[in-house]
C-alpha cells in the first residue's frame, strides 16, 4: 500500500472484497483518494491482480475521470521505477489507455456504438447540440398542435381550454416540461401512462386507504410534534410560575389530545379525532398574585396551537371521500390526454432526429438501457445477453458520487453489476426485487457481489437534474457495518480539509437543523464530521462569524440630510451587504504588512499572508447579486471575478451584434434597428433619429430611411409608401429640409446593409460574423473600451457559437437568430467569457453548486437572508416522479378553477424536497472552508426576528422540525440554532433580550455574531460624493443674482488648503508612476509635460491594426505568467502552450504571433531560467501595496512640514522564486535595448520598491534582483 497513513475506516474501504460496498464519505474525507487507492491495490495485488480494463469506474465528470487515470498512471510508473523488469506493471500501463474509467454517459455511448445494430440506429449517428434539439422540439410541437387542431381532437381541445389559457405556448411549455421529466424515468411511456391511470378510480375507491392519505397524516404529525413542544413548554411555565396552576388541567387535556393523534396509524381515526375535538375553555379566575407575564405567554402559545389545529380541521373536513372521488374522475380524461400528448410529441421528435441521424443527450442513457435490458415471461425486467457479457467482463463496478445517481443510471448499473434480482412495476412505481432470476445460461460468478459505491448523501444537490438521493439512502439504511455480509457499508466521516473551528461549527448547526424530514437524514453524533486535519499550534483558528444587518433599520430624515441621500439610494440592500463583505475582506487581507489573516499553504508547508485568491464568496444564485458585489468590491480596490451563468446576452457588445444580425435578416424591426443606429457601428445621434422618424410615424423606422434614400437618389417610391403618406408634398418638404450630412449618412448605411444582406446568404454564419467584426471595426472598438479584453472575449464566444451552429442540421441567418434566442432561455444565459486563469490573485464569486468538490482557505457565504425559490409550486400542473401529476381542477363550463387535492399533496411534497435540497446545499457551502468561515445575511426586522428565534429555542438539542419546515431562508434555520448558543449571549444583550437565558447551549463550537446597521455602511458612500456636491453648489451660486451671503459662501467653498502642494499628490501610486516621477526630477531642462493632443482616427479603425509596444509587453507577460516551466523542453512544447492560451481565449491568434517560442526557450535554458525551474516556490504576478514617506517620492515637498505624510505604492511583481539563501526577484522587459546601463538606470527605482515590498510581505531577504531582456535574450543583475 502507499505511504499515506490511512485510517482504519479508509483501509476497510480500500481492501474489503466480495460484497456490495457502500462508502458514506463526509465532506473532506478523502473519498477520491480512497477510490483511487482501491483501484491501485486491485491492479497491483501480488496474489490476485486484476487487469485495469476489467474494472468499470463511473465518475461524475470527465475531469474526475482524467484525474483518476493520471493518479493510477503515476502509481504504476512509481512501481516500475522500483521494479523496472515487472511485466505485469508494464501490461497495466499499456491497458490504462483502454481502461473503462469514464462518466456514465461515456460508458453508455460506448455500449451504443458497440451494439448499434440491436437498436436499429445508423452507426454514423451524431449527438445533437442542445439548442439544435430545442429547435427540433419546437418544430415537432408546432406540427403536432396543427395536426390535432385540424382533426379537432376532443381530448386535446379540452386540454387546451383547461390549461393553455389564451396561448398554446403555455400548454406547450407543460408538454416540454413533462417530456423532460418523464425522460428521467427508465421507461418514460410506462411512467406517463401509469401516472394518468392513478386518476382512473372506480366505485370502490376509498381515499382513506390511499398513499395520499398516509402522506397527509405524516405531514400533519410533524406539525403536531411542534404543537406538543409548545404545550409542554406552557405546562412547564404553569408549574413554575406563581398563581396560574388552574391552567394546568386544560393544557394537560390539550397535550393528551396531541399525543393521542401522534399514536394514530389510521387516517380515518386521525381525521375523526381532530374533527371531533373541542378545546376546553380556560378558567376565568382572578388571582392578584398571578404571574401576569407567564399567564399571557402560555395563553399566546395555546392560541397559536388552537389556530393551527382549526386550520387542519377545516382542511380535513373537506376530505370527503365522495368529493375526492368525483374530482379524480373529472380529472382523468385530461390527465390521460396529457400523457398521450407527450407520447405523440416524443414520437414526432424522435422521427425528426432519425431523419437527421441524430440522438440527444437523454437518448444516450435510454438507448443504452434498451440494449442492456430484456423481459421474462412475467414481464420482469432482467439483464439482456449483452448485459450478461458485461457482467462477465467486469470484475468490479465502482461508482463515484453515487448520491447523485438517477433511476435510469441505477437500472443501467444494476444490469452490468453482479446482482441477484429483477426490476418490476408495483403500483405504478419501478421497484428492484432482490431474488434469484432464471437465466437460460447460468452466469459464472453471479453469486459474488461486485459493486463499490461511494458518495455523501448530505451533498446530493442535483435534484433539479432528477438525481434521486433516496437511491443512496435506501442502501445506507439497509446495509450493515458488519463484516462478511454481502451488503456492507463503511463510514468515512473524518475531515482532512477544515480546521477544528469550522468542523465544530458545522456539526453544531446541522445537529440542530438537519433531520429526516428536512435533509432526509438525521444529523446525529454518528453522522457528524470528525477532525482529521492538523494546522499546528503556530496560528490559532478563529470562530465562525455571523454578520447580520437589519433591512428595516430606520434611517431618520436628519441622517439622510446629513449624508445628502434620498431614501431609495439609502436602502439598496444587496449593495449594502456587498459593502459589508468588502469591509470584511479588507480586514482579512490587511495591508500586506500586518494585521491580515495567516493561512497555511500546503505547497510551502508553512503559514503565509492571506491573498485575495484564497477567498471565495458563495451565493445560492449569482445572477442578480454577483454584479452588485463585484461593483462594491471593486470600489474598495479589491480585485474580484464573478463566475456566473448570466449576463452574457445583456452585455452591450453582444446585444449590439445580435441586433445587427436581426436587421440584416429583417430590417423592419424598430428596436434592433435603433440599437444599431445609435451604436458606434452607425453613430446616429438622437436628434438625427428624431428627424428620420418625422418622415412618417405610421410605418417602420427603416421604411422612413428608405423614403429619404429614394427621394434623395431621385428614385421612384413604391405604391406601398404612397399609400401610407398622408401628404406627399409635406413628406417631400420634410425630406428636403433634412441636412445633407444626414442624408449621406442614411444612404451609406442602407447601401452597406444591402451588401451585408447579400453576403449573409453566401457564406457560413461564423465567417459572416467575423466579417462584420472587421468590416464595422466594432471588434477593435470594444477592445479599446474599459474591460476591452473581456468584451472581445465575449464577441469571440458568439463567433464560437456560430461555429457550433454550423455543425447542426440548421442553416441560414434566420435560424441562427432563433438558435441564439433559444440558447438564451434553454441555458439560462451563459455568463460572460472567462478570461482569468486559476492562479489569478482575485476574490472569486461563485454559486454554491459550482463550489462543490472545491475547497478554499476562506469562505464567505452571502445572501443567507434571501428567500428560497419556490416559484415552481405556482404552476397549474405539478409533476412528481413518485406521486405523478398534481393538476389544478379546471371546469371550463362552470368557470371553476382551484388546486385539486392531489395537487396540494404533491405541492407540499415538492416543497419539503426542495427544503431538503436547500439544507444539503447549505451543508456543501459551509464545508468548503479550510480555515475561516463567514456568513452574512439581511434580516427584515432584527428585534422581532431574534424574538421569534428565541421562541423556537426551548429544545437545546434540536430546532423543532415544524420550525425548520416553515423556514424561508438559510437565516431562518441558522438563527434559531445559534440564538441559544453560549456565544449568542452578546447578541441578546445588545438587543436587550432577557428571556430564554435558561436554555443556553454550552457547545464547543465557537461563533462570533456581529450586528451591522445601514448607517455604518452608508457613511463612507457619502464621503465619496462630497467634492462633487460642493462643486454643484458653487455652480448654482454662479448662476444666482446678487445676495448678501453669496460672496461669503463662495469664499468658503473656494477655500485653499494650507498644504495645497500635498493635497494634489495622490494617495496611491503605481511603481511605474514612481519611476516616471524620478525620471522627471532628474531632467535639468523644463520640458512641457502636457502637449497639445492631436486627434486622429484610431488605429483599430484603419486597414491594419499594429500591435503597440505596450501591448507586446502585456502579451509576453501574460504568457510568462501561465508558462509551465516543467513542460517547456523544446519549441514544440512552447507552441503547444501558446495554442492552449488561444483555445482558452486568453490571447488571439494574431496576438500569439508576438510570442517567439525560440526566445522563450532561450529563457528556459538560461542559467536564470534553470534556477527558476529548480525552485520549489515560484510566485508570479503578485500584486502588492506598501506605505512610503511622500517626501521620498516628491522631493519638492518640505521635509519638515510633510514628514508624516504617507503614500501607498501599488504594483505587480512579475516573478520571484525562493532559493536556500533567500528570494530571487525577476522582472521581464520587452524594451529594445541599445545601452545596458540606461536600462539599469531606467528600472532601478522600480526594482528597489519591488525588493522593499517583498522584504515586508514575506519577511525574507531578497538575495538577487534581475531584469530579463527578451530583445537580447539575456539578463542583467541589479545591484
Swiss-Prot record:
Residues 4-499 form the UvrD-like helicase ATP-binding domain. One of its GO terms (cellular component) is cytosol. Pfam families: PDDEXK_1, UvrD-helicase, UvrD_C. Keywords: ATP-binding, DNA damage, DNA repair, DNA-binding, Exonuclease, Helicase, Hydrolase, Isomerase, Nuclease, Nucleotide-binding. The keyword Isomerase applies. Residues 526-853 form the UvrD-like helicase C-terminal domain. ATP binds at residues 25-32. PANTHER family: ATP-DEPENDENT HELICASE_NUCLEASE SUBUNIT A, UVRD / RECB / PCRA DNA HELICASE FAMILY MEMBER. The heterodimer acts as both an ATP-dependent DNA helicase and an ATP-dependent, dual-direction single-stranded exonuclease. Recognizes the chi site generating a DNA molecule suitable for the initiation of homologous recombination. The AddA nuclease domain is required for chi fragment generation; this subunit has the helicase and 3' -> 5' nuclease activities. Belongs to the helicase family. AddA subfamily. HAMAP family: AddA (MF_01451). This is ATP-dependent helicase/nuclease subunit A.
Amino acid at each position: 500500500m502507499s505511504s499515506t497513513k490511512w485510517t482504519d475506516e479508509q483501509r476497510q474501504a480500500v481492501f474489503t472484497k466480495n460484497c456490495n460496498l457502500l462508502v458514506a464519505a463526509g465532506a473532506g474525507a478523502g473519498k477520491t483518494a480512497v477510490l483511487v487507492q482501491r483501484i491501485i491495490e486491485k491492479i497491483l495485488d501480488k496474489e490476485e491482480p486484476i487487469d485495469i480494463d476489467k474494472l468499470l469506474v463511473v465518475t461524475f465528470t470527465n475531469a474526475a475521470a482524467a484525474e483518476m487515470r493520471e493518479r493510477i498512471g503515476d502509481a504504476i510508473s512509481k512501481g516500475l521505477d522500483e521494479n523496472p523488469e515487472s511485466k505485469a506493471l508494464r501490461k497495466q500501463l499499456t491497458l490504462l489507455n483502454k481502461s473503462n474509467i469514464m462518466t456514465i454517459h461515456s460508458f453508455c455511448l460506448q455500449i451504443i456504438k458497440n451494439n448499434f445494430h440491436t437498436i436499429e440506429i445508423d452507426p454514423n449517428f451524431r449527438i445533437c447540440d442542445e439548442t439544435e434539439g430545442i429547435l427540433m422540439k419546437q418544430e415537432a410541437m408546432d406540427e403536432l398542435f396543427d395536426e390535432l387542431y385540424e382533426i379537432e381532437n376532443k381530448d386535446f381541445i379540452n386540454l387546451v381550454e383547461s390549461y393553455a389559457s389564451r396561448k398554446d405556448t403555455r400548454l406547450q411549455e407543460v408538454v416540454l416540461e413533462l417530456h423532460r421529466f418523464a425522460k428521467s424515468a427508465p421507461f418514460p411511456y410506462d411512467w406517463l401512462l401509469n401516472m394518468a391511470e392513478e386518476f382512473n378510480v372506480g366505485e370502490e375507491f376509498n381515499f382513506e386507504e390511499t398513499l395520499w392519505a398516509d402522506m397527509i397524516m405524516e405531514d400533519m404529525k410533524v406539525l403536531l410534534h411542534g404543537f406538543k413542544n409548545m404545550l409542554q413548554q406552557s405546562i412547564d411555565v404553569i408549574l413554575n410560575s406563581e398563581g396560574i396552576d388552574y391552567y394546568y388541567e386544560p393544557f394537560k387535556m390539550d397535550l393528551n389530545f396531541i399525543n393521542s393523534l401522534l399514536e394514530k396509524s389510521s387516517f380515518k381515526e386521525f381525521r375523526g379525532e381532530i374533527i371531533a375535538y373541542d378545546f376546553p375553555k380556560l378558567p376565568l379566575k382572578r388571582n392578584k398574585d398571578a404571574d401576569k407575564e407567564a399567564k399571557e405567554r402560555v395563553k399566546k402559545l395555546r392560541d397559536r396551537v388552537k389556530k393551527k389545529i382549526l386550520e387542519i380541521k377545516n382542511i380535513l373536513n373537506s376530505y370527503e371521500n365522495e368529493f375526492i372521488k368525483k374530482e379524480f374522475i373529472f380529472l382523468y380524461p385530461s390527465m390521460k390526454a396529457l400523457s398521450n400528448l407527450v407520447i405523440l410529441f416524443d414520437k414526432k421528435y424522435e422521427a425528426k432526429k432519425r431523419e437527421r441521424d441524430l440522438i440527444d443527450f437523454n437518448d444516450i442513457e435510454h438507448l443504452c438501457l434498451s440494449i442492456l435490458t430484456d423481459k421474462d415471461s412475467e414481464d420482469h425486467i432482467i439483464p439482456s445477453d449483452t448485459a450478461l457479457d458485461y457482467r462477465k467482463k467486469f470484475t468490479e463496478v465502482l461508482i463515484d458520487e453515487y448520491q447523485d445517481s438517477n433511476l435510469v443510471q441505477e437500472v443501467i448499473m444494476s444490469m452490468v453489476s453482479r446482482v441477484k434480482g429483477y426490476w418490476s412495476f408495483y403500483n405504478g412505481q419501478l421497484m428492484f426485487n432482490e431474488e434469484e432470476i432464471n437465466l437460460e445460461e447460468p452466469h459464472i460468478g453471479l453469486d459474488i457481489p461486485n459493486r463499490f459505491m461511494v458518495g455523501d448523501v448530505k451533498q446530493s444537490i442535483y435534484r433539479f437534474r432528477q438525481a434521486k438521493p433516496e437511491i443512496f439512502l435506501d442502501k445506507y439504511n439497509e446495509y450493515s457495518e458488519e463484516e462478511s455480509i454481502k451488503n456492507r457499508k463503511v463510514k468515512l466521516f473524518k475531515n482532512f480539509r477544515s480546521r477544528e473551528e469550522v468542523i465544530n461549527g458545522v456539526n453544531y448547526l446541522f445537529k440542530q437543523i438537519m433531520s429526516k424530514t428536512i435533509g432526509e437524514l438525521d444529523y446525529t453524533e454518528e453522522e457528524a464530521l470528525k477532525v482529521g486535519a492538523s494546522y499546528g499550534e503556530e496560528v490559532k483558528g478563529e470562530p465562525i462569524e455571523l454578520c447580520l444587518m437589519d433591512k428595516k433599520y430606520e434611517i431618520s430624515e436628519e441622517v439622510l440630510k446629513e449624508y445628502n441621500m434620498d431614501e431609495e439610494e439609502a436602502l439598496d440592500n444587496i449593495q449594502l451587504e456587498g459593502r459589508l463583505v468588502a469591509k470584511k475582506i479588507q480586514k482579512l487581507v490587511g495591508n500586506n504588512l500586518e494585521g491580515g489573516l495567516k493561512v497555511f499553504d500546503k505547497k510551502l508547508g508553512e503559514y503565509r499572508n492571506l491573498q485575495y485568491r484564497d477567498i471565495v464568496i458563495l451565493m445560492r444564485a449569482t445572477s442578480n447579486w454577483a454584479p452588485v458585489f463585484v461593483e462594491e468590491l471593486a470600489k474598495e480596490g479589491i480585485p474580484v471575478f464573478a463566475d456566473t451563468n448570466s449576463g452574457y446576452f445583456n452585455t452591450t457588445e453582444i446585444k449590439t451584434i445580435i441586433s445587427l444580425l436581426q436587421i440584416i435578416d429583417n430590417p423592419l424591426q424598430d428596436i434592433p434597428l435603433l440599437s444599431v443606429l445609435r451604436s458606434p457601428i452607425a453613430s446616429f445621434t438622437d436628434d438625427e433619429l428624431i428627424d428620420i422618424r418625422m418622415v412618417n410615424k405610421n410605418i417602420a423606422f427603416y421604411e422612413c430611411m428608405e423614403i429619404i434614400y429614394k427621394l434623395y437618389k431621385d428614385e421612384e417610391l413604391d405604391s406601398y409608401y404612397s399609400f401610407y403618406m398622408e401628404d406627399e408634398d409635406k413628406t417631400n418638404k420634410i425630406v428636403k429640409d433634412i441636412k445633407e450630412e444626414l442624408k449621406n449618412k442614411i444612404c451609406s448605411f442602407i447601401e452597406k446593409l444591402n451588401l451585408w444582406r447579400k453576403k449573409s446568404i453566401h457564406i457560413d454564419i461564423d465567417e459572416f460574423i467575423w466579417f462584420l467584426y472587421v468590416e464595422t471595426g466594432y471588434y477593435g472598438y470594444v477592445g479599446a473600451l474599459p474591460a476591452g479584453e473581456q468584451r472581445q472575449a465575449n464577441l469571440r464566444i458568439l463567433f464560437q457559437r456560430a461555429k457550433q451552429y454550423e455543425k447542426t442540421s440548421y442553416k441560414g441567418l434566420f435560424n441562427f437568430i432563433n438558435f441564439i434566442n433559444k440558447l438564451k432561455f434553454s441555458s439560462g444565459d451563459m455568463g460572460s467569457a472567462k478570461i482569468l486563469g486559476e492562479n489569478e490573485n482575485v476574490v472569486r464569486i461563485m454559486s454554491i453548486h459550482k463550489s462543490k468538490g472545491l475547497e478554499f482557505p476562506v469562505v464567505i457565504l452571502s445572501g443567507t437572508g434571501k428567500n428560497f425559490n419556490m416559484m415552481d409550486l405556482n404552476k397549474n400542473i405539478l409533476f412528481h416522479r413518485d406521486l405523478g401529476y398534481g393538476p389544478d381542477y379546471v371546469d371550463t363550463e362552470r368557470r371553476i378553477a382551484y388546486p385539486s387535492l392531489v395537487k396540494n399533496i404533491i405541492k407540499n411534497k415538492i416543497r419539503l424536497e426542495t427544503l431538503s435540497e436547500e439544507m444539503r446545499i447549505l451543508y456543501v457551502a459551509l464545508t468548503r472552508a479550510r480555515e475561516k468561515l463567514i456568513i452574512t445575511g439581511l434580516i427584515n426586522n432584527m428585534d422581532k426576528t431574534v424574538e421569534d428565534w428565541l421562541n423556537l429555542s426551548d429544545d437545546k438539542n434540536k430546532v423543532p422540525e415544524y420550525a425548520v419546515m416553515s423556514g424561508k431562508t438559510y437565516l431562518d434555520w441558522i438563527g434559531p440554532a445559534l440564538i441559544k448558543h453560549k456565544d449568542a449571549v452578546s447578541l441578546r444583550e445588545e438587543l436587550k433580550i432577557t428571556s430564554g437565558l435558561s436554555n443556553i447551549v454550552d457547545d464547543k463550537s465557537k461563533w462570533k455574531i456581529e450586528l451591522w446597521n445601514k448607517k455604518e455602511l452608508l457613511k463612507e458612500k457619502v464621503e465619496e460624493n462630497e467634492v462633487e456636491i460642493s462643486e454643484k453648489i458653487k455652480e448654482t451660486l454662479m448662476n444666482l443674482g446678487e445676495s448678501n451671503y453669496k460672496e461669503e459662501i463662495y469664499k468658503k467653498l473656494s477655500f485653499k488648503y494650507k498644504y495645497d502642494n500635498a493635497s494634489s499628490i495622490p494617495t496611491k501610486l503605481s511603481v511605474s508612476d514612481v519611476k516616471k516621477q524620478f525620471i522627471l526630477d532628474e531632467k535639468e531642462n523644463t520640458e512641457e509635460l502636457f502637449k497639445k493632443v492631436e486627434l486622429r482616427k484610431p488605429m483599430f479603425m484603419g486597414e491594419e491594426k499594429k500591435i503597440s509596444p505596450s501591448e507586446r509587453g502585456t502579451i509576453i507577460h501574460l504568457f510568462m505568467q501561465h508558462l509551465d516551466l516543467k513542460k517547456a523542453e523544446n519549441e514544440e512544447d512552447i507552441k503547444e502552450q501558446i495554442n492552449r492560451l488561444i483555445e482558452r481565449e486568453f490571447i488571439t491568434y494574431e496576438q500569439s504571433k508576438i510570442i517567439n517560442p525560440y526566445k522563450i526557450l532561450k529563457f528556459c535554458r538560461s542559467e536564470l531560467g534553470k534556477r527558476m525551474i529548480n525552485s520549489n516556490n515560484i510566485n508570479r504576478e503578485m500584486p502588492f501595496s506598501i506605505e512610503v514617506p511622500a517626501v521620498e517620492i516628491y522631493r519638492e515637498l518640505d521635509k519638515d512640514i510633510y514628514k508624516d505624510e504617507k503614500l501607498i505604492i501599488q504594483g505587480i511583481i512579475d516573478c520571484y522564486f525562493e532559493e536556500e539563501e533567500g528570494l530571487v526577484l525577476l522582472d521581464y522587459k520587452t524594451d529594445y535595448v541599445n545601452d545596458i546601463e540606461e536600462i539599469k538606470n531606467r528600472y532601478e527605482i522600480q526594482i528597489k520598491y519591488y525588493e522593499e515590498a517583498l522584504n515586508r510581505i514575506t519577511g525574507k531577504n531578497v538575495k538577487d534582483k534581475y531584469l530579463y531582456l527578451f530583445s537580447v535574450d539575456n539578463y542583467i543583475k541589479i545591484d
